């Protein structure tokens, strides 16, 4: 009970876009040695929230990128806050998964970041509408595996197309 047999995929060409460190992607990279001669991949965890804020706190088009605080010097975390239309802001925080402190809570770091004097005023009196978290692949071009193999191709985070330094993930996934 509860078991369902897998399916056979039969196609001339299959596009695999299952996200960061996807199960099939890992198997395909290993089977076809798509990462041969590449640097090891690096991973992070990212948190994102969408807020509805007061009209007087909203500056449509404003973009804030930060790095560092509240993370320790040896934990290169980064964050963003984007003012969108309709008095909404998108904010996020990314922490690499190779952090040294076993007591570090990336979620708590994100919550602390929102109290910074450059961030808090925008959120005061606002309401969080949605939130989420996900794994991120952030090794860069030197870690990017070959994306094509016999009968298929890897796309997006399955291949590692995120440009972490420029915070370009959706853009590069669509282009892949």
Give the predicted meaning of each segment:
Residues 1-121:
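Predominantly flavin-linked oxidoreductase catalytic cores and closely associated redox partners
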Residues 101-102, 106-176:
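FAD/FMN-dependent oxidoreductases across multiple families
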